[in-house]
Curated annotation (Swiss-Prot):
Gene: cofH
SMART domains: Elp3
Leader sequence residues: none
Organism placement in taxonomy: Archaea, Methanobacteriati, Methanobacteriota, Stenosarchaea group, Methanomicrobia
Entry function: Catalyzes the radical-mediated synthesis of 5-amino-5-(4-hydroxybenzyl)-6-(D-ribitylimino)-5,6-dihydrouracil from 5-amino-6-(D-ribitylamino)uracil and L-tyrosine.
Full protein name: 5-amino-6-(D-ribitylamino)uracil--L-tyrosine 4-hydroxyphenyl transferase
Pfam families in alphabetical order: CofH_C, Radical_SAM
């Protein structure tokens, strides 16, 4: 274990210079340090959530070059179809629905707020919905500020937001992989404003394409800075780039397994106590590498999902659904204690 790094992480003193040096460290010492930090900060529980993803449309005016989901099937769910999916989620014990969709030219703030109101009027379930880009887009379409949109969504019943659309928080990289998407400062503004009006979010990174480790490290420190200012980030979710069926596939085959594990370890070390929850996405990594990530800093495996269209369209072979029993078995096989949680990391049962 890297004792000095361990101590400085716990006291919140890790610098970007430290992180650069850690890239040259013995990887197994790096992983062990992250694992010991995980044990100190959150213990041996590994959490999961019973939830359902609902992607309500793949129509999108966006230009993200890493996306394999846009206009793939050409669908848009009606409100009744969305409600049917929420009802099915409730019947199977879901505590959360995660709702995201493409950016359309005919949906406005009231459409998004109406969707949340309709769900909340019929079901007692946590709504985790709409990426920062969706909020930015609906605000522009409706001629209102981001803060006005977020306040309207909160009144409608929005409980939390996914911190997706972060990709790499570097405008030079963003101009290549997602031209026209909200900028780094705009992503920070949407997320920080959400926290200010009482909507917690997650935070993500989508790595393994054209960016360098320097870009990744800067991204992690931007996220840490946001958390230190707002304290509204519930978890950090590294998303390894899925390279099939998109225009970035010729530039990268994605991150190596070792780089995936370095990402989890560095996130744990850099965030320390600031963001205690680091999620290993079984959809992105597969169950076996997700188990390894649990020994490299991660303490959560995400959700049951029930349906997952975005990673699947980009070549994920990990499936769309794992039952609670499946997730518990995966966690136990990694030598850890499975615990069900809600969206805000309250343990259930």
């Amino acid at each position: 274990m890297l004792k000095d790094i361990y101590e400085r992480s716990l006291s919140g003193e890790i610098t970007i210079e430290d992180a650069r040096k850690l890239l040259e460290a013995n990887p197994f010492e790096l992983f062990d340090t992250a694992d010991q930090l995980r044990k100190e900060i959150v213990g041996d529980n590994v959490t999961y959530i019973v939830n359902r993803n609902i992607n309500f449309t793949d129509f999108c005016v966006g230009t993200c070059k890493f996306c394999s989901f846009k206009n793939n099937k050409g669908f848009r769910l009606t409100l009744d179809e969305i409600l049917q999916r929420v009802g099915a989620a409730k019947e199977t014990g879901s505590t959360e629905v995660c709702i995201q969709g493409g950016l359309t030219e005919d949906m406005y703030l009231e459409d998004y707020a109406g969707m949340i109101r309709a769900i909340k009027s019929k079901y007692d379930i946590h709504t985790h919905a709409f990426s920062p880009m969706e909020v930015y887009h609906m605000s522009r379409m409706s001629g209102v500020t981001v803060e006005e949109s977020l306040k309207t969504l909160k009144v409608a019943g929005l409980n939390s937001m996914p911190g997706t659309a972060a990709e790499i928080l570097d405008d030079e990289i963003r101009s290549v992989i997602c031209p026209g998407k909200l900028s780094t400062s705009e992503w920070v503004d949407v997320v920080s404003t959400a926290h200010r009006v009482g909507i917690p979010t997650t935070a993500t990174i989508m790595y393994g394409h054209i960016e360098t480790w320097e870009h990744r490290l800067k991204h992690l420190f931007i996220v840490r800075d946001v958390q230190r200012q707002t304290h509204g980030i519930t978890e950090f979710v590294p998303l390894t780039f899925m390279h099939e069926n998109n225009s970035l596939s010729g530039k990268s085959m994605g991150a190596s397994g070792m780089d995936d594990l370095r990402m989890y370890a560095l996130a744990r070390i850099i965030f320390g106590r600031d963001i205690p929850n680091v999620q290993a996405s079984w959809v992105k990594l597969g169950t076996k590498l997700a188990q390894v990530a649990l020994n490299c800093g991660a303490n959560d495996v995400g959700g049951t999902l029930m349906e997952e269209n975005i990673s699947k369209s980009a070549g994920s072979k990990s499936g769309e659904y794992l039952s609670p029993d499946d997730l518990q078995a995966m966690i136990k096989a990694a030598g850890r204690i499975p615990r069900q949680r809600n969206t805000l990391y309250k343990l259930l049962g």
